[in-house]
Structures are given as structure tokens and as C-alpha cells.
Amino acid sequence: MTLTIKEVTQLINAVNTIEELENHECFLDERKGVQNAIARRRKALEKEQALKEKYVEMTYFENEILKEHPNAIICGIDEVGRGPLAGPVVACATILNSNHNYLGLDDSKKVPITKRLELNEALKNEVTAFAYGIATAEEIDEFNIYKATQIAMQRAIDGLSVQPTHLLIDAMTLDNALPQVSLIKGDARSVSIAAASIMAKVFRDDYMTQLSKDYPEYGFEKNAGYGTKQHLLAIDDIGIMKEHRKSFEPIKSLL
């Protein structure tokens, strides 16, 4: 008895590799619905394979450390919030488990929000250790954004429940005695930094959403403190609040 297209599709969707798909008995079924199902499954498998290859590439720097130091405890560090006109700069320090496998990890700005939230929950529940560090708008104004970012990163490291032995940092160097590697675009090149990027992004977005409840005019829940049209119009209308960065333009020129 010939299987229905729905039944064949279920069989096809259970296939786990492209090779298996091409050798499947249904591969030669010429019905359009079956061929469409095969094409969809191939596309999904190709996407999954690309994510796996990307993930392997992003473990390069971790593996280089582990070659020389098999017992290394590697901490990835990243920040979000250097560019906004309001709110803190937030850093996260993350130590992944040895058997980590978080397909889709990348620079948090490139990860769709649904996937970002999914990864964040998995990371919070499964990593060896993580901690956040915050530098306030006042500290940003006092020290400058670069120094404030360093402060936030060090606070995140200090907050870890497990002491790392090596640091992988996104485009920064820290005054820290631990061996460290600074990587330009590290959140797209290292799984440890990418994990920290995701966690810092979700934490800061949540913070700004909460802030918007007290200051709804600025639209922080949508712009995260960046200088959008709504945000700038609100500043012109009602002025600034305590979490605005007075050293950032155009706010600086308004004072």
C-alpha cells in the first residue's frame, strides 16, 4: 500500500543526515508533495550542519588553551550597552561546561530574539558559572565609557562562583593577572564570549524594559537607551533622567 504524503513527510522529517536523506526509499517518490518535503528537510539539515561547523570553528580559541592547559577553566567575557544614551553598560562573565553544545551561539545582535531568549535560559541553567557586572551611567560619565566597560567586566569576573584560570575577552584588555586573550569581534569567534554576549544582552534589555515602566516617555523597552527618534524627542520634551549619560552627545550639549 502506498504511503500518503503526510506519512512520507513524517518519515523524511525523522532523517538526521543529508546522506541518509539521499538514500531514503522515498527519495525517488516523484509526487510533488514528497519532493517538497525532501527539499524542506534538506534545507533544514544543511542549516543545522552549517551551525555545527560554525560552532566547531568558534571553539578554536578554547581548544588552543586546553591543548597547553588541559585543566583550564576558561571564562568568556563580553559587554553590551556602550553606545546608548541611557542606562548602564552591562558585562557578563561565563564559564561553559566541558560538554557544551549551544548551536546558534553568535554575536547577540545577530541572533533572533526568540533564539536569544532560548539560549539565555539554557545557559543560565547549565553553565558552570556566570555573573554580571554593571557600570552605571554616573560611572560612565565619571570615567569614560572604555574605563567603565573595564570596570563592569572586572565586576563580572569578581562575581563568579568558580575562579577561572584563563580569560577570553571581546576586544578589551583588563588589568587582571589571569592569562587573557582579547579578540576583535570575539562574540562571533568564541563560544565562551558569544555565550557572555547573549546573557549580557538579555540582562540589559530586561533592565531597560523595567526602567521604561518608570519612564515610559523614552521608549526604553524598544530602544534600550539608544538615540531613536522617540527617545530624542522625549529628551527635548521633558529633559533627561538619572540614567542618562551626561557625557554623551547630544545630551552633553543640552546641559
From Swiss-Prot:
SUPFAM superfamilies: Ribonuclease H-like (SSF53098). This is Ribonuclease HII. Its EC number is 3.1.26.4. HAMAP family: RNase_HII_B (MF_00052_B). It comes from Staphylococcus aureus (strain JH9). Pfam families: RNase_HII (PF01351). It is an enzyme of class 3 (hydrolase). A divalent metal cation binds at residues 78-79, 170. Residues 72-255 form the RNase H type-2 domain. CDD domains: RNase_HII_bacteria_HII_like. Manganese or magnesium. Binds 1 divalent metal ion per monomer in the absence of substrate. May bind a second metal ion after substrate binding. Coiled coil: none annotated. InterPro entries: RNase_HII, RNase_HII/HIII, RNase_HII/HIII_dom, RNaseH-like_sf, RNaseH_sf. It catalyses: Endonucleolytic cleavage to 5'-phosphomonoester. Keywords: Cytoplasm, Endonuclease, Hydrolase, Manganese, Metal-binding, Nuclease. It comes from the Bacteria. GO terms for molecular function: manganese ion binding; RNA binding; RNA-DNA hybrid ribonuclease activity.
